[in-house]
């Protein structure tokens, strides 16, 4: 698996569309977006050779709006076709590249993985609550109680090493980016959870072991951002500061 362009600068309005070679596979990405990270993780997990184009989704390049009407990330381009939306891209990838499927083919098991993703969407909602705390620290106690409740729910849903069973699967790759955003928030002191051994062995032992396996996996390491840069971008977004889509690339 070769992902090229993961650390490329984000293209903004006025930037030219990079030519796409015949037969090439491309991912349009935003480095700090959890929905875009879903697609990136899935591509990496399937071992697809892909060119990554990072896009400034605030000051969008004109040509990108022809690929995604809202100018959001992610999108993929393959065989002259563009597929958008982080829930649809994984299934497309499994159908287009069936030799290394992640979503089960068994109808019942497939539904179970989709149900898990649906239940774990609450983690994204919990992460969003922490944006409000970044804007108003007096809300911390109120909001973090709800975050703890969601993490306990996720702890109870984790019946094996991974949500996908004995190895990372569909539900793991689609939910991980939102757990990661709560982890980023720990660096901003807006939630009382540990940075190391996140989210905490005492209260969430299964989830803590799961997160450790995921964050140190080759798949995640190939696409993720550091805690330092992720938390800085998250804080800038929450507090309506100017966003640096290339944060960390000059270090």
How would you label these PLM feature ranges?
Residues 1-167, 240-251:
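GST-like domain detector, emphasizing the conserved glutathione-binding G-site
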Residues 35, 84, 88, 175-179, ...:
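Tryptophan-centric aromatic hotspots in well-structured domains and transmembrane helices
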Residues 38, 115, 119, 153, ...:
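Alpha-helical scaffold segments in carbohydrate-active enzymes
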Residues 103, 197-198:
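Membrane interface segments of multi-pass transport proteins and intramembrane proteases
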Residues 161, 183-190, 220-224:
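Substrate-binding/catalytic groove segments of enzymes
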Residues 166-191, 200-203:
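GST superfamily/GST-like fold recognition
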Residues 202-231:
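A contiguous, mid-protein "functional segment" used to position or interact
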Residues 227-244:
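C-terminal/domain-terminus segments
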């Amino acid at each position: 698996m070769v992902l090229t362009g993961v650390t490329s600068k984000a293209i903004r309005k006025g930037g030219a569309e990079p030519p796409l070679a015949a037969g090439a596979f491309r991912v349009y990405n935003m480095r700090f977006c959890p929905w875009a990270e879903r697609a990136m993780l899935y591509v990496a997990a399937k071992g697809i050779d892909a060119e990554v184009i990072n896009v400034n989704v605030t000051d969008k390049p004109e040509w990108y709006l022809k690929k995604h009407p809202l100018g959001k990330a992610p999108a993929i381009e393959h065989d002259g076709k563009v597929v958008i939306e982080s829930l649809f891209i994984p299934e497309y990838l499994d159908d287009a590249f069936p030799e290394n499927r992640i979503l089960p083919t068994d109808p019942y098991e497939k539904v179970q993985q989709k149900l898990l993703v649906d239940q774990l969407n609450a983690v994204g909602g919990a992460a969003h609550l922490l944006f409000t705390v970044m804007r108003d620290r007096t809300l911390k106690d109120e909001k973090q109680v709800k975050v703890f409740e969601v993490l306990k729910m996720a702890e109870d849903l984790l019946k094996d090493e991974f949500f996908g069973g004995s190895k990372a699967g569909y539900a793991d790759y689609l939910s991980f980016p939102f757990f990661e955003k709560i982890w980023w928030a720990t660096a901003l002191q807006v939630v009382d959870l540990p940075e190391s051994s996140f989210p905490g062995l005492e209260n969430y032992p299964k989830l803590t072991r799961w997160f450790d396996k995921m964050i140190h996996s080759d798949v995640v390491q190939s696409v993720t951002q550091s805690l330092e840069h992720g938390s800085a971008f998250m804080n800038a977004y929450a507090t309506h500061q100017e966003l640096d889509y290339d944060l960390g690339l000059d270090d």
